[in-house]
Amino acid sequence: MIIDSETKRKLREMNAAELLDAFERLDERTVMPLNHAEVVGLAVDNAYGGYTDAKIQRLVKRAGLRYPQADLRTIDLAEERGLDRGVLAGLDAGNYLGQRLNVAFQGATGSGKSFLLCALAESACRGRYRACYIRMPDLAEQVAAAALKPGGPAKLVRKYSTYTL
């Protein structure tokens, strides 16, 4: 779609570069039969999709996941693993987050608990919840270090209370 240079400058100045890119990606032949409202709607939908994808990627990166590529939708549900498809689908929906329910994993070493947890955190990030991955030994170390500082324990609690998961 053809946009004049002054409009491009204004969109960039307003930090709407994603919207500008979305307008530029629209094909003239595709948008010709559409009215202005439909063209703007297409461009905004396109820009919003890019915005949400970037936001999810930032949330996953900030979570510090051990396995950032983990995804509940692609977990192998082989019979011998004993994973219930319904339970995983329920966890992927994220209802437990709104209800403030806890999820606990138990199993032998190497059974995939960390991978499942990372997949759960990635799913929460897709739902735009803040998540943080920390191992218990690391958390215990942080608690011990915070205990030595004045106001340290309260600061540590505030830090982790900002995360939903």
Question: How does the language model describe each region?
Answer:
Residues N95-G98, A124-R126, R158-S161:
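Conserved catalytic network of the ASCE P-loop NTPase/AAA+ motor domain
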Residues R81-L88, A131-S161:
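Short glycine-rich substrate-engagement loop in P-loop NTPases that contacts/grips substrate
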Residues A70-G94:
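N-terminal pre-Walker A segment at the start of P-loop NTPase domains
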Residues R100-L116:
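Walker A/P-loop nucleotide-binding motif
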Residues N102-A104, A131, L165:
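Residue-level preference for the first positions of well-ordered beta-strands
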Residues R12-P68:
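Interdomain "pre-motor" coupling segment immediately N-terminal to P-loop NTPase/helicase cores
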Residues E122-I134:
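Post-Walker A helix-loop "phosphate-sensing" segment adjacent to the P-loop in P-loop NTPases
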